[in-house]
Structure formats: C-alpha cells, structure tokens
Amino acid sequence: MASETMGIALGMIETRGLVPAIEAADAMTKAAEVRLIGREFVGGGYVTVLVRGETGAVNAAVRAGADACERVGDGLVAAHIIARPHREVEPALGNGNFLGQKD
C-alpha cells in the first residue's frame, strides 16, 4: 500500500454526523480527480472522510467538501491536507474501514 501512495496528497474532513460527511464526500469527488479512500466513525457522532490524489486536486476537493459540509449546517469540524504524508503515517490509514468494502 505504501509504495502506491507515496507522494500522493491526503485530504481529510471531519464532521459532526453522517449527513454532512456524505455531502462532503460527494462534493469532493465531484470537484476534482481524487479517490475516496475511507471514512472513520471517530465516536460521539464525529465522522472523518479521507481522499487521496495529486496535491492540487486534493486541495480543491477539500475546499469543495468543506463548503458543501457548511451548507448542510454546522457539521464541519475540521478540514486538512497533508501534501506528502510520511511513510510512517501510511499504516495508520490502513484501518480496514474503507468505503465499498465489507467489514
């Protein structure tokens, strides 16, 4: 996994609730060529959505996702981009909680 994602940006949006997270994920994937790699139910109703792609695309996607999330209500908690995550960060992303896969 690490070899195919090295040098690819990581975008994250954390929301209060599932509806803003879905809205953000939809907006991110429509706004730029990014791959929706996962979601994490953090607890207490918080959901984090993660995308990967080229830095410019991830930047545009996270901005669009954050804007869409704010339109749903006050669901946006945080939005952040890591341009090139260190290889030591990659195992933390591989939690098996990816969209489209059965648990």
From Swiss-Prot:
Tell me which PROSITE patterns the record gives: BMC_1, BMC_2
The GO cellular component terms are:
carboxysome
Record-annotated BMC domain positions: 9-94
Instruction: List, alphabetically, the Pfam families matched.
Output: BMC
Query: Which ranges does the record mark as transmembrane?
Result: none
Which CDD domains does the entry link to? BMC_CsoS1 (cd07058)
Among InterPro entries, the record links this protein to: Bact_microcomp_CS, BMC_dom, BMC_shell, CcmK-like_sf, CcmK/CsoS1_BMC
* Family matches, as SUPFAM superfamilies: CcmK-like
Q: Which UniProt keywords apply?
A: Bacterial microcompartment, Carbon dioxide fixation, Carboxysome, Photosynthesis
State the Gene Ontology BP annotations: carbon fixation; photosynthesis
GO molecular function terms noted in the UniProt entry: structural constituent of carboxysome shell
Domain description: The tight homohexamer forms a pore with an opening of about 5 Angstroms in diameter.
What's its job?
Answer: One of the shell proteins of the carboxysome, a polyhedral inclusion where RuBisCO (ribulose bisphosphate carboxylase, ccbL-ccbS) is sequestered. Assembles into hexamers which make sheets that form the facets of the polyhedral carboxysome.
Q: Which family does it belong to?
A: Belongs to the bacterial microcompartments protein family. CsoS1 subfamily.
The protein depicted here goes by the name Carboxysome shell protein CsoS1
Q: Which organism is it from?
A: Prochlorococcus marinus (strain MIT 9313)
